[in-house]
A protein has these predicted regions:
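Phosphate/diphosphate-binding glycine-rich loops and adjacent basic-rich segments that engage nucleotide
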Residues: 138, 142-144, 148-181
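Structured beta-strand/loop patches that form or line metal/cofactor-binding pockets in enzymes
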Residues: 218-263
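N-terminal lobe of the biotin/lipoate ligase/transferase fold
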Residues: 1-97
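Contiguous, small/hydrophobic- and glycine-enriched helical/loop subdomains that border
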Residues: 83-123
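Active-site- and interface-proximal helix/loop "cap" or "latch" segments in soluble metabolic
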Residues: 182-185, 261-326
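A conserved active-site cap/scaffold subdomain adjacent to cofactor or substrate pockets
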Residues: 159-160, 169-213
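Beta-rich nucleic-acid/ligand-interaction surfaces
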Residues: 119-136, 218-226
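Flexible, glycine/charged-enriched surface loops at secondary-structure junctions
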Residues: 114-122, 208-221, 296-300, 310-314
Length: 326
């Protein structure tokens, strides 16, 4: 595993680092890649989430907290300079294997610091059964990206104020608030190590060499960054709804379904949520459903060739149809 270095260490906006992942995944083929980064206060929401459902926009504006969408699925997270973001790029196509390989490696690093670390089998890393790291998955041809948080310390007031998880999501985890289900490394390290020392330790344990990006690399990364900054990408689009509902599917995630119907014919549909995406929802699910009747029989026929688990991680086609039908 090689550590990816920038020629300058200035803090950049969050989409730059997401673009850096994409660039590395496309250009560097011979090595697995790892790097860490930090940003000024920012909320990052998943590829298929509705910003109005997940982010307290007035709070973010009032406190100067940036908001950006990423291209991976999963839920909404808050990051600041006390929260280390980690990126891992590998050639594996298997989502479960990629997650497992990465989270297991990070858990082992934390255990070497004497911490009671574990992973929860999906995408979180825990210390004493409380979340210290959440991760998401993004697939490019021939390469997979896992990226996520590592809560060294953070502004809990901003984290709670900026993000608005549904009560159903919290209830599914058996907790009453964001604060009660997370922890920070600083709580457990008790002053033994500062954030820079921790980053140095992680790098030494995870990597066996460096790759230094050039000014030409940076220019190309900045071009990719622009794709994250369009209003269309950040805010997305919703059909004019005649039917909107929310549903949680155990082991898969939370869904917000918006459907535009005309005499019970599906004119448009939007599937949002914090689930993990492995394929194209637009091509594999939405396109086949446009123009069909909103009934179980016609949905089943329209999706008869679909294996939903190849598009949405851990979901069966029957679960998908049940979710769309509410």
């Amino acid at each position: 595993v090689k550590y990816l270095l920038l020629p300058q260490t200035d803090t950049r906006i969050l989409p730059f680092y997401l673009a850096m992942e994409e660039y590395a995944a496309r250009i560097i083929k011979d090595d697995d890649i790892f790097f860490m980064w930090q940003v000024n206060p920012t909320v990052i929401f998943g590829r298929n989430q509705l910003i109005a459902n997940e982010v307290n926009i007035p709070y973010c504006r009032e406190h100067g907290i940036a908001t950006y969408r990423r291209k991976s699925g999963g839920g909404c997270v808050f990051a600041d300079m006390s929260n280390i973001m980690m990126s891992y790029i590998t050639c594996s196509d298997n989502v479960e294997l990629t997650f497992s390989r990465y989270t297991s490696a990070v858990v082992e690093v934390l255990k070497k610091l004497g911490l009671n670390a574990s992973d929860n089998g999906r995408n979180d890393i825990l210390i004493d059964d409380r979340k210290v790291s959440g991760n998401a998955f993004y697939h490019l041809p021939g390469r997979s990206i896992v990226h996520g948080t590592m809560l060294f310390d953070t502004d809990m007031a901003h984290m709670q104020g900026a993000i608005t998880p549904s009560t159903e999501k919290l209830a599914s985890k058996g907790v009453k608030s964001v604060r009660s289900r997370i922890t920070t490394l600083s709580e457990h390290l008790a002053g033994k190590m500062n954030i820079e020392q921790f980053k140095d330790f992680v790098k030494s344990e995870m990597c066996d060499g460096d790759i230094l990006l050039t000014d030409s690399d940076i220019a190309q990364i900045e071009e990719i960054t622009q794709t994250y900054l369009t209003p269309e990408f950040i805010y997305g689009s919703n059909p004019r709804c005649t039917n909107t509902f929310q549903k949680r599917v155990d082991g898969v995630g939370e869904f917000q379904i918006s459907i535009e119907l005309d005499h019970n014919i599906i004119k448009d549909i939007n599937i949002a949520g914090d689930f993990f995406v492995l394929g194209s929802i637009d091509e594999s699910i939405i396109a086949p459903l446009k123009g069909v009747s909103y009934t179980r029989e016609t949905l089943t026929e329209a999706l008869k060739d679909l294996d939903a688990s190849t598009v949405i991680a851990s979901m069966t086609t029957e679960q998908l149809i049940n979710t769309i039908l509410n």
